[in-house]
């Protein structure tokens, strides 16, 4: 596995975990670079700005993955997913972390400081670093479909999807 370039970010609700996880990442031999996009100890930058900055670094190739922390991890994942080409997930258990990479090729992991303990967060990040998506896997075609939906949305501004039919029940 090629050493990873990781970008980290948090809002004020995830600052303490971000700092601990950033130190763990910097000490991990699988990581060659850690870039912190905020927040600082006394900052209150809104999480969408932090998530967007981190996701942009992944999308444009300046980082391989991003680790984001807020209160729940949910807002960070939602905001990061607004960047074309990004697949961000919130995961608070080992199986979800594993499948996020192996099945979905997610490049962004969002954690919630108010949801999991620090030692579990540390374990999940260590596990996350060990997974690498296999472009020849059975999941590759599904990930390619996700990428195609992303491109179609970016190109046309319209949502693509299946045809739907509405039926009214009763009279």
Language model features with spans:
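Short, well-ordered secondary-structure micro-motifs
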Residues: 18-20, 45-49, 78-81, 121
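Helix-adjacent hinge/juxtasegments
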Residues: 50-91
């Amino acid at each position: 596995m090629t050493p990873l370039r990781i970008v980290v970010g948090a809002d004020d609700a995830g600052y303490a975990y971000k700092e601990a996880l950033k130190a763990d990442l910097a000490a991990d031999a699988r990581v060659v670079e850690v870039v912190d996009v905020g927040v600082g100890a006394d900052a209150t930058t809104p999480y969408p700005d932090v998530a967007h900055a981190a996701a942009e670094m992944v999308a444009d190739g300046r980082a391989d993955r991003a680790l984001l922390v807020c209160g729940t991890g949910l807002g960070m994942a939602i905001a990061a997913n607004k960047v074309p080409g990004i697949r961000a997930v919130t995961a608070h258990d080992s199986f979800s972390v594993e499948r996020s990479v192996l099945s979905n090729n997610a490049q962004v992991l969002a954690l919630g400081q108010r949801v999991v303990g620090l030692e579990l967060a540390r374990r999940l990040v260590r596990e996350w670093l060990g997974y690498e998506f296999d472009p020849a896997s059975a999941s590759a075609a599904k990930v390619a479909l996700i990428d195609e939906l992303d491109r179609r949305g970016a190109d046309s501004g319209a949502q693509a999807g299946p045809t739907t039919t509405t039926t009214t029940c009763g009279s």
